[in-house]
From Swiss-Prot:
The keyword Mitochondrion does not apply. It comes from the Bacteria. It comes from Xylella fastidiosa (strain M12). Its EC number is 2.7.1.2. Belongs to the bacterial glucokinase family. It is an enzyme of class 2 (transferase). This is Glucokinase. The lineage of its organism: Bacteria, Pseudomonadati, Pseudomonadota, Gammaproteobacteria, Lysobacterales.
Length: 337
């Protein structure tokens, strides 16, 4: 691997996996060094700093700069992963790694920044609305981004005259809005367990299990302990309840993605990312996702013109962190050690 003279360590840290790579901020169109990517289970390390040390030792590279995208809320010097017990302190981590500069950003800030360098080969169109390609330097665009994985990430990207401004949100934690009698019953069942039910309780890996458990309770069945992959495998084998679960997941996903467009004013398109999208892509394409996405009453005709695009780039979080490293001066809230 040929590393640049001053590489930046970029990381995409979720509730399950920690992904690391190197970025060359001098490269405009492709700042991520793809052959540098490594992935580790977060459970294998007591802290993010130790995971990063392991990566740098493994590849034999020294650097003093980093951009870490965290699947959780970033509050000044501290970031908490929503679905994992790691608490990340910027100054402590920077000192542990010997960094001069360390940026902590929300993972969907990174996902949003990646949009600016995605090409047609990196996305698959869902529905008939087409994505309008454009020269970034002349663009004025509003995009939404949503992605189910261990949790549900939501963000956006505003582009003005070639400058990219990511929108950091915790939109996965807004209340789930049921739209059918079946969804109302599911909400009632999940409310007994969780009290308040957010979109993330349904549209995520654990959400697949929650939907299946609720449908099983409606049918008077005890399904026993199941993992998300067990349910998707059963659906692939034709199991009726598992198939209902995946179809309902896709339909609700479409409905809340359409809501995101209306809330953010993401009139130029919405990007679907996260670990579940590639795995469920065929189901999303052949489900009621677009129907529920577009079915917004008096705005249905407008929604029909808005593209929804599944991101198939293998590492959009790392790519976006690399773009952030390249464009730090354009992004508010620079964090330095």
């Amino acid at each position: 691997m040929n590393a640049p003279q001053a590489p930046v360590l970029v990381a995409d840290i979720g509730g399950t996996n920690a992904r690391f790579a190197l970025a060359n901020p001098t490269l405009t169109s492709a700042p991520l060094l793809n052959d540098s990517m490594r992935e580790f289970a977060v459970i294998e390390f007591p802290s993010l700093g130790e995971a990063a040390q392991h990566y740098l030792h493994h590849i034999g590279i020294h650097t003093t700069k980093g951009v870490f995208a965290i699947a959780g809320h970033v509050d000044g010097d501290e970031a908490r992963i929503t679905n994992h017990p790691w608490v990340i302190t910027r100054t402590r981590t920077a000192t542990m790694l010997g960094f001069d500069t360390l940026h902590l950003i929300n993972d969907f800030v990174a996902q949003a920044m990646a949009i600016s360098v995605l090409g047609p080969q990196d996305v698959i169109q869902i529905g008939s609305a087409k994505w309008e390609q454009f020269p970034l330097s002349a663009a004025t665009r509003n995009y939404g981004i949503i992605g189910p994985g261990t949790g549900l990430g939501v963000g956006g990207l505003v582009i003005r005259n070639g400058r990219c401004y990511p929108l950091e949100t915790e939109g996965g934690h807004v209340s789930f809005p049921p739209s059918t009698p079946e969804e109302i019953r599911i909400l009632e069942i999940l409310s007994q367990q969780f009290g308040r039910v957010s979109n993330e309780r349904l549209i995520s890996g654990p959400g697949i299990v929650n939907i299946h458990r609720a449908l099983s309770e409606i049918d008077g069945i005890d399904p026993g302990p199941l993992r998300p992959q067990d349910i998707t495998m059963r659906a692939a084998d034709g199991d009726i309840r598992a198939t209902r679960t995946i179809n309902l997941f896709c339909n609700i996903f479409g409905a809340i993605t359409g809501d995101l467009v209306l809330i953010q004013g993401a009139w130029d398109g919405v990007f679907l990312t996260g670990g579940l999208v590639p795995k469920l892509l065929n189901s999303i394409q052949h489900s009621g996702f677009r129907q529920r996405f577009e079915h917004k009453g008096r705005f249905s005709a407008i929604m029909a013109r808005i593209p929804s695009l599944a991101v198939i780039h293998p590492h959009p979080g790392l790519l976006g962190a690399a773009v952030y490293a390249r464009d730090t001066e354009q992004v508010p809230q620079e964090i330095k050690a």
